[in-house]
């Protein structure tokens, strides 16, 4: 009777071996490793997805920072205004200076040809001189207008520099003040050149008036001569007529 259970167990084992072949140890290990890799991959991916991702937000700007930004923009705008007015003024002063020297040259040529021209030639040259004088006065009015705008630009830039300094925008304040000094130097140089030309023009006109008066005493000119109207049309500063 005891052999019957053993036979049953052996038969059952045989059936299992035929239906499900035994897998080698190496294949089992590989299968286990692959299974664990899949499990780990799924686990790690699930963990990463579970981590909340926060959005980066810019720090809130303080009122002081906003004021500094605003005053820096004001400083930049005032510097632009100052640059434009400086360019216009310097260019206008240069044109005026050129016109003054042109008038000086015409008057000197006119004086050197006084004894060599008839009345018609003298009148023609005098008309050219009058035209040059009108142009010079127009250019002077133009540069005076630009000078007024330039002075307002300087005042505005100075206020912007002070506002930048008071607001803590030191770099903007220093930049504007340096810009003011540079443009003031440029304008002063142009003014000096114009002043030198005006002094030479006044001296030339004074010499012409004195020469005309001397010649008129020896030989009174006929009425309506352009030379006789020189002293009436020209306004010579008293400082240039004074003899030291």
Swiss-Prot record:
Residues 1-38 form a transit peptide. It comes from the Eukaryota. Residues 207-244 are annotated as: Disordered. The keyword Membrane does not apply. InterPro entries: Smac/DIABLO-like_sf, Smac_DIABLO. It is found in: Mitochondrion. Pfam families: Smac_DIABLO. One of its GO terms (biological process) is positive regulation of apoptotic process. Its main location: mitochondrion. Belongs to the Smac/DIABLO protein family. Homodimer. Promotes apoptosis. Acts by opposing the inhibitory activity of inhibitor of apoptosis proteins (IAP). This is Diablo homolog, mitochondrial. It comes from Xenopus tropicalis.
